[in-house]
Amino acid sequence: MKERDAAPAERGKPATYTGDKKAKMAAKTNKKWVRLATVFAYVLSVSLAAIVLAVYYSLIWQPVGAGTSGGAAGPPPGGSNATGPSGTSGAAAAGPNTTGSSRREAPRDVPPLQAARPAPPEPPADSPPAGPLERPRGPDEDEEETAAAPGSR
């Protein structure tokens, strides 16, 4: 009889006396509390990591322009990295060829399309100078462009 008192009932067997039943109930309750505490700690740690990342990306991180060629690296002259020159969003002000990817790339000295393109041939001296192909602009359009981007030229 003492052998049965010393060893608790094995898993799956019904408890044969009151002390064994209480021990099983206590072990089950302890397992539930340990599982609940583990889940709570996991949720708390993931939430804390999300808060830290949100604070970092909203207050500390400053994006690096991918198309800069030989300028001083730093924040844009507008003062804020969230808006562009005329109040547009940072993604719209970055340029037409940028993507919304969250991947951060190292800045390049020369954009790849300009590096691969050969220099244009010199025009003959007797032909009139040919400028880039774009539509002619009126005087008010030039004023709007210079007002929208004061440091671009």
UniProtKB/Swiss-Prot annotation:
InterPro entries: InaF-motif. It comes from Homo sapiens (Human). Residues 118-131 have a biased composition (Pro residues). The keyword Transmembrane applies. This is Putative transmembrane protein INAFM2. It is found in: Membrane. Residues 1-23 have a biased composition (Basic and acidic residues). It comes from the Eukaryota. Residues 1-24, 66-153 are annotated as: Disordered. The chain crosses the membrane at residues 36-56. It is a single-pass membrane protein. It holds the Pfam family InaF-motif. Residues 79-101 have a biased composition (Low complexity). Keywords: Membrane, Transmembrane, Transmembrane helix. One of its GO terms (cellular component) is membrane.
